[in-house]
């Protein structure tokens, strides 16, 4: 199940990561006239601490909702027992894929000619703890939103609601849930702080 979810989300996640990496570095090094190293550090901060896990979970939510509904139709209220752990694992792995894609996009967009030095600076700015937390956060976000969505869709099917409307409703509810989880995470569980990378 996790493998099927990953295959469905892999391509869009890679594309989203590349677009984010290219966009952030081009903006920072172009109109904002920042150094190449600062641009990459900004990209790392955005991907790992601010927008990465939530953006990834939202993208996966939109792609996987029809499959989650299908499992609820087949398995009823028991669907979450297999879907939720699978979604959590997929969320963590996709976060790693998203991070690599964003970093590749950032390096490609960098105006610096020394590619080896660019990669060295990039790796120097990545803290393993931050990467692990981002993967954990993405897994928790996607797992919880999967549980919520399947529980709500099971209730809707009992009331004989239209499946298309159920998917639409859960996309909206999932977005709100993700925003609330993000708010709790950055204010209570893991407040945002800036850590200087080694020189």
Language-model-detected regions and their locations in the chain:
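Membrane-interfacial helix-loop-helix connectors in multipass membrane proteins
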Residues: 27-51, 101-143, 147-169, 192-199
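Bilayer-spanning, highly hydrophobic alpha-helical transmembrane segments
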Residues: 92-109, 147, 175-185
